[in-house]
Amino acid sequence: MSAKSNQRGAKAPLLGSKIKLNIEKLAIGGAGVARHEGMVVFVPQAAPNEEILAEITLVKKNFMEARVVEILTASPHRREPPCPVAHTCGGCNWQHITEEEQRRQKHTLVLETIKKFNRDLEFNYLPIQPSPRVLRYRNRIQPKFKNGRFGFFARNSHQIVETMDCLITEETLTDKFAEVKAWAEKKNAKDLQRLEMYIAEEGDVRYGLITDEDDGIGFSQVNRFQNEDLLRTALDWAGDGPYKKVYDLYAGAGNFTFPLAAKYAGSEIIGVELNPKLVERARSKITDKRMTYFMSDVETYMRRASIGKDDLVVLDPPRAGASEYTMQTLAAAQPRKIIYISCHPVSLARDLNWFFAQTQKLGIKYKLDRVQTFEMFPQTDHVETIAELRVDS
């Protein structure tokens, strides 16, 4: 592959060439960030504040990717991963970094991302909420089975890293790995890559295949220990009310819906969720006539919703975030308060930008009151964030 030029006109290194890099920080996606002759270089499995010898693996117009060949000066935040397969398994990309530094990097990443989309946005940015567990916290996983091999996909590959344990998974699940492997072998299939294991609400372990017709249990919080703290914060930030209606958008099986119904006894509670199995599960638990669950994608629902100024809106979208239409419609509806829970900093920052662009256009005064990150996924770059938006009176 021929060398390409970067924006400053200097030639980028050839593919496969080796260069020295100083890792400045970590990026969304988990890679270390360095600069070489004005060009950004992303290096997986690097750690902040270390010097490495790296091999260029990808050259693009505005950035490069590289792999660590040798650590010349180790980061003070680098450690030996607690998991023996962490260097090859694709499940955890930050096990080589201390937990304290993981939290610091996530906290910084969210702030930088929000400011990148809207540098004028002012808000109270609270310290990150650590997870009660940094290991053994996942209650839902998707192990892989292929040609007698049981484990997880290797990083950036469909090759299976064999393991009969996973240090970020609750032992209630990992204790069943041998049973699940034996079950997979009995199915006499060469390739069972769409397995799912989870701890049910009743406390028992369930497992099976995910099919095109059945996409598993759908979205649910995988860290029940941290989810309790997130719920408490969301309910606290929502305030005392009273609200005429309380909307839970992207409601899942009711993680927020039912606690909201318990807190706001005089409000009409509306959940909106697209996944039919999650809607069915939520509806089966409803005993209060004030509660209604709609099976719909949120944007379609917003086209007929009657959200008012005396209402509370809670939304917890997937990684892709909400749509521009949804955020603009929310802004125009002017609910008294909005609690936004996000699992991806970029979609959060983009959605906030859409929202405040619309309020400015309509002459509506809203305030981003406070933002806090939650360490929902230790040992990975993923982070949960909660934001409170309210009418600025």
Curated annotation (Swiss-Prot):
Top-level class of the enzyme under EC nomenclature: transferase
Similarity-based family: Belongs to the class I-like SAM-binding methyltransferase superfamily. RNA M5U methyltransferase family.
Transmembrane segments: none
Active site: 343
The species this protein was found in: Bdellovibrio bacteriovorus (strain ATCC 15356 / DSM 50701 / NCIMB 9529 / HD100)
GO molecular function terms noted in the UniProt entry: 4 iron, 4 sulfur cluster binding; metal ion binding; rRNA (uridine-C5-)-methyltransferase activity
Protein name: Uncharacterized RNA methyltransferase Bd3828
Alphabetically ordered keywords of this record: 4Fe-4S, Iron, Iron-sulfur, Metal-binding, Methyltransferase, S-adenosyl-L-methionine, Transferase
Domain TRAM: 12-70
E.C. numbers: 2.1.1.-
Any one Gene Ontology BP term: rRNA base methylation
Record InterPro entries: MeTrfase_TrmA_AS (IPR030390), NA-bd_OB-fold (IPR012340), SAM-dependent_MTases_sf (IPR029063), TRAM_dom (IPR002792), U5_MeTrfase_fam (IPR010280)
Residue positions binding [4Fe-4S] cluster: 83, 89, 92, 166
Annotated positions binding S-adenosyl-L-methionine: 221, 250, 273, 316
Classification via CDD domains: AdoMet_MTases
